[in-house]
Amino acid sequence: MKTKTRKILIKAVIVLLCVVALTLGWIIFDATVDRSGWRETRGGYYYRDFHGHQVTGWLETKYGRYYLGDDYKMVTGWKKIDGEVYWFAEDGTMATGWRDIAGERFYFDPQGRRQEGWVEMEGSRYYLNPSLVSGWQEIDGQRRWFSPDGSMVTGWLILDETYYLDENGVPLTGKADIDGSTYYFLEDGSCFHGWIDLEDGRYYFLPDGSMATHWQELNGKRFYFGDDGTLATGWLEDGEYRYYLTYDDGALTGAQILDDKAYYFTPDGIYVLLVNADNPLPKSYVPELVDLDGRHEVASVCLEPLKNMLTDCMKAGGEYSINNTYRSYAEQKDILQTRYERYLEADPELSDNDAWQKALAEVARPGTSEHQTGLCMDINGAGVESVPWLLEHCWEYGFILRFPEGKKDITGIVYEPWHFRYVGTRVSIPMRDSGLCLEEYLGAA
């Protein structure tokens, strides 16, 4: 009886152990059979190795890399392991490369470690903090701009303001030369445009941000800036032309008083020497003279334009003769004196004053004749008082008809179709188009 009872108990224990083994997964298998694989139980995934033992730590499979915690459970989401941060997808695979997680973008190296700070790839630089940043960021005390894809921007950046970012992504400040032009950037890096006073002078930066040089028309006024961009003031020589520039108004125009002396400027600001009864030259005035044809002298500035004009006139079939060019103060005085004496001799009863008035009606007072400038010349036609070709084309060479028809009330001189004055093409062409005489054009009428 006891033996029978013992056998029954042994069988019961064996059955119980089998039940427990099945429940806990303790099953004795053949050691040569692969028992590895995933099991889902107790709300998670677990992995058994070849021998059926549960795995912890890192797991490499052909599907990816996984991590199983101390509880044998497969990790998902964020996990810090040995001081490094990793992320595992819902299926447990470790993330590498770029990943979008909860609306943010992260980068993981090939070992799955989340990267922070600077990352460079495919020619672009990125900054992770720890997710990918974009827009303005202050890094190591310096501002940088990152595009929506996270790449750091260099070169020109146009937002509400315009910036230029150097090779390190840092906005330039102060004056900077870029692609052959100079720009000025404020302390916040924005590109400045408009007037600005710096330690070395006054500058103007155009709407595109580039520094103004040479002539610029700003708000209806003409200013001149040197090659270095500094605003020029005072007298300026630009080729054969002269200008007077002020700090606020740029090139002066019209009639101006400078150092108690009258000066006259065109609408473009070019100074023109005006000589008439109201604006006489001093006795000492002598221009730089050169020989024209062995008989006449002219101011050096008009020699080549005059030769070109006369040569082209001859080519066009025009015939001319030059009667007068430069005449000194003394020569003008002698001519007036001779004319005065001639009237007295012709009419002994003529009073001294009347003789002078008759002479002055025909001969300009010394200092008031344009011939003293060396810039004018009397050119007649062959047997006639004028050369039609010159009347039509003189403007193209920088000459004007000094005393045009219908302007005697302004110039004080009757129409003289032979009297030409050199002013340069920058003056002669717009003056021709204006229809004004010299006094009108210079604001002296």
Regions found by a protein language model. Give the residues of each.
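Extracytoplasmic cell-surface/polysaccharide-interacting catalytic and binding patches
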Residues: 257-445
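Extracellular adhesion/carbohydrate-binding repeat motifs centered on closely spaced tryptophans
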Residues: 2-271, 392
